[in-house]
């Protein structure tokens, strides 16, 4: 009843939109416990997604970012009021006043929930020095991030955060809010658990190391939940592209029984044969959610250094193959320029029919590491600067 009253007052108020947004987020965070909040967001997301698929069946295979923007959210909730409960219907009405759609609101709530654990003090707002200097940084792979006692700061949050919260916040700000990868919201726990690579700046005058890059590493023991094997990334819409030399490169790794994969005609067929013939399970992983922080030039540098550091650590740990999903062709062009056989392209697909391709492929970790060890950041930057596929202003 208190929530209903507060929502009614908020809807009737003439507060500026920014203050309304803040008040609505605070109301939800104070009303629902974390598990209740997650259940609420998942339930309404599924309810509206199913509804939108019925209304626009031609878009039902597309991403959440596309589905939730095919119809104005305020029009949607007015024409099709929520039938889950009166409380949820009123909440959606308030969300419609303040946010683009439900998933945009969910993202903001999760960001605020993490930031609320340690409010940002005014004296902490100072420019952070992130030098373009390899020796200023170091990489680490942490097996169970949820059990780590490591405290870090981030370029946008110069106060100590548990590493699991720092990674989740980075994923929220970079991928979900920045790239609109809303499918990550119900899987946010993956940012706070399991195996992760992190790139840290050595503390100088700061109290904590600074997190500038992270990536999720999933071992073969979890392959059933890999993104690579999720339906949108493993179907016949994908154009299969593994070359004859790619098959030879896989055979040379000696991870299959029998040692060579027979030629495949599709991504699903390749995935099936790979799973059936894989004998050296500990040599294979999936690498996802590679985030980098900073301004454009810093991001370019951290993308280079994070890959180099991570490859070194993966190789030391005995990994031979890393599954990847990449949506930036400039990265693939760089791989091809430094060592054509280090990256094995499996296929590509225009997932949302927007003329933007997503690529599935494999890192040959040993070859990729050797290639990175023979280039420096100047080479990397020159390659990107000359690349017609990049929208980044590389100087």
Curated annotation (Swiss-Prot):
Top-rank taxon, per record: Bacteria
Root EC class: transferase
Pfam families with a match to the protein in the record: AHL_synthase (PF17327)
Entry keyword set: Autoinducer synthesis, Quorum sensing, S-adenosyl-L-methionine, Transferase
MF terms (GO), sorted A to Z: N-acyl homoserine lactone synthase activity
GO aspect biological process, one term: quorum sensing
Similarity remark: Belongs to the LuxM / VanM family.
The protein's name: Acyl-homoserine-lactone synthase LuxM
Lineage: Bacteria, Pseudomonadati, Pseudomonadota, Gammaproteobacteria, Vibrionales
Segment forming the signal sequence: none
EC number, as in UniProt: 2.3.1.184
Catalysed reactions listed for this entry: a fatty acyl-[ACP] + S-adenosyl-L-methionine = an N-acyl-L-homoserine lactone + S-methyl-5'-thioadenosine + holo-[ACP] + H(+)
